[in-house]
Amino acid sequence: PPRSTLFPYTTLFRSLGFPVVGDWVVVERQGAAGAIAIHQVLPRQSQFVRQAAGTLTAGQVIAANVDTVFLMSGLDGDFNLRRIERYLVTAWDSGASPVLILNQADQFADLPAAIAQVETVAIAEPIHVISATQGDGLDQLTPYLSPGKTVVLIGSSGVGKSTLTNYLLGEQQAATQAVRLDDSRGRHTTTHRQLWPLPGGALLIDTPGLRELQLWSANTGLAETFGDIQALAADCKFRDCQHQGEPGCAVQAAIAVGELTASRLQSYQKLQREQQWIEQRQDTQARLNTKRRWKQMSKTIRQHQKRKR
C-alpha cells in the first residue's frame, strides 16, 4: 500500500512523520512470512532535521533517537569554520550532543593551529583530532560508544565517515573512495543512511555526505553555538542592540580589542536571519496545511450527509 496509509501523521509537516533511520516503530507481520507493516512511529527523543533541498518548505529528518552527533570535518580543503558553526546549530537543535571530529590528522602539518581555530567556534563542545585511515586517536571516541547509545556521523563527502565506520565495525562494510586532490571534494560512497550495530553494543548511523545544510528548527541551537556573543550582548547599552554601530555595544567593543572576530558575528547574524526566514515559511505552510485539512473534512461531512438523504 502507499506509505501514507501505513501509519498516522502526527505533525503539521507530513515529511517529518515518515519513519527514518533510528526510529522505534510499532509493526505487524502479515502472515507467518509476510510483509511487515509499520503502524506507528514512537515519539522521538531527538531528531537531526534540515530544510529539505529544493523550493518546498519541508523538513528532512536525517536520523532520529540519537544521543551523540559526530560532526566530521577534514583537515584539507573541506575545513570551513562557518560550516562547522552551521553543523553545530543544527546538532544542538536536534536534542543530541555534538562532538567535533577533525579527520586526516596525518595529512596536516600544523595541528595546534587548526585546533585553535576550531576552538574559536566550538566554545563548549569536545574536539577530537583523528586519522581514520591510520587509526590514530580513535580511542578518544570510546566513551561515546557505550552499550545502548546511538551515534550519527554527519559531514561532507570525503571527510572519512565510511572509513571511520569500517574501523569501528572492525571490518570492511561501508564502501570508501579517495578524495579528489584538485579540490578536496569527496565522492558519494555512502548513498543511503544505514544503522550499524557495533561490537561493543552501541549503534552507529552512517549518512551520505551533505552538500548543503539549511536550518529547520528554532530551538536552542543558536544560543548554544554562539553563547559567547549572547553573553557579550547582555552587556550592551540597549536591549534591542543590533551590534551594527549603536553606542555602548559590547559586541563591537569585543571585536575592536580582538576578543571576537567580525566574521563570527556576521555568521551569527546570517544564521539568525535564516532561522527567522524559515520560521516565517513554516508558519505560512502550517496555515495552508490546516486550511487543506478543514477543507477536506468539510467535503467529507457533506458527502456523508448526502448519502444519508
Q: In which residue ranges do the predicted regions lie?
A:
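Conserved Switch II/interswitch segment of TRAFAC-class P-loop GTPases
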Residues: 32-49, 65-83, 96-99, 105-110, ...
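Conserved acidic residues
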Residues: 67, 149, 261
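Short, small-residue-biased leader/transition segments that mark boundaries at the very start
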Residues: 1-12
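Helix-rich effector regions associated with P-loop NTPase G domains
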Residues: 16-24, 29-32, 42-62, 97-98, ...
